[in-house]
Amino acid sequence: MISTPENYCCVIEKKLYFGNRKLAENEEKLKEIGIKSIIDLIGYKNDNERIKHSKFFNLLNLNIIDTPLNNADWAEKGVNFIDEQIEINNPIYVHCEQGLSRSATLIMYYLMTREKKTFKDSFFYLKQLRNVVCPTTGFIKSLCLLDQKLFDKNSFNIDDYSLFTLKESFPLINENDIKELYDKNKKFYNENFDLYNKEANDKKSEPIGYKTIDDLLEKFGKEKMLLRKGCSLHHPFD
């Protein structure tokens, strides 16, 4: 199943689903699917929405900020809630705003810790289900650390992820050209770590990937860029 940004995805049949806010606001559709529990990773805009959902669904509300400076330390709480709901046969829907980053991160954390999939296997499994998945690099770094902890290896490190994302965004540009610019920027920021930290904090972005995108646009032009609905070009890095 290939998903669009409007769709939800079934990760485990009749047990675990994830996607965006749009479905979370459609009570009739949730009931049609059989959803009984919800994890909201963005927080409700007002208490009335929270009360409405609480009447019909078991709810875990986590207000998670989606930036490269944030990590995934919160994910264990979400995974424990998933365990509890699956144990009592309550199908659960995990969502963030667009179903790209926060919800995908929690699902990958679940697949790694409960299904014993490596980070690489978890990531590409979700990409097959929902091709717009693109967590920010802060969450990716946390999943890389989890990969090392669980499997004593990095099956897919931050450079692998960044290069994959860049190649996906610029499919008409030679991979070697992308890697050359990425490696140049990585070397520059490794040698200027104070500047790296300053830009990361000032712009709330991942400087290496962000700068590489800008360099690619400047060198090759926007006509080489793939326009993807639901996920901005810089999203994984800002």
Residue ranges of model-derived segments:
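Short, small-residue alpha-helix embedded
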Residues: 103-113
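Short, amphipathic alpha-helical interaction segments embedded in low-complexity terminal/linker regions
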Residues: 153-238
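Cysteine-based protein phosphatase catalytic domain of the PTP/DSP
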Residues: 2-94, 98, 113-145, 150, ...
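Intrinsically disordered, low-complexity segments enriched in polar/charged small residues
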Residues: 100, 107, 233-234
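Short amphipathic alpha-helical interaction/hinge segments
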Residues: 104, 151-154
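Generic structural signal for isolated residues within well-ordered alpha-helices
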Residues: 109-110, 125, 165, 215
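Secondary-structure junction/capping motif
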Residues: 103, 118, 187-191
